[in-house]
């Protein structure tokens, strides 16, 4: 591996991780909101999501690799899987924990359901949602790297295996350091968005003291 090839490996790892996390964030929050508003979806999808969350997602990696090859897609799918469930389960908990009396009172003033959602329900649910966002951020780099260790011919996990076998621990530690920085960057960005969106929450006030 030359410097150019190593740079491509790092870029690929970042792309897999960030893309998978963003997709999981959109899907997880979307399903969480939908399930919280629908009793039918709550009875059908929630138990399914809980059962899948208890299944080691990495066990699916060989299947995805056999279906989609060694390209980008199976790695992104693994990242989506390991990030999706913390997000969706915390979103369901967040939106189902809100007081119905408060939302009904606000609607009684003439507010529409859409306005009630953005004014009352979403702000109140965001603190718990961010718990899922941050937990998923921790999982993202782990999921992408393990998927590459299991089956890949290009990614950073594969690169670390190769340079370790070639007795280059310096390059292996450089890869591990990059993974740490990547994970901290994603986590830090989520934390920054948390401070911007919910500065009023007690957890933010304690952090900022």
Predicted regions span which residues?
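Short helix-capping/hinge motifs at transmembrane helix termini and TM-loop junctions
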Residues: 35-40, 68-70, 82, 150-152
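Generic hydrophobic transmembrane alpha-helix motif, especially the helices
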Residues: 50-86, 93-94
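Short helix-to-coil transition segments within interhelical loops
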Residues: 95-101, 105-125, 165
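Hydrophobic alpha-helical transmembrane segments of polytopic membrane proteins
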Residues: 157-194
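Short cytosolic juxtamembrane segments of multi-pass membrane proteins
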Residues: 195-209
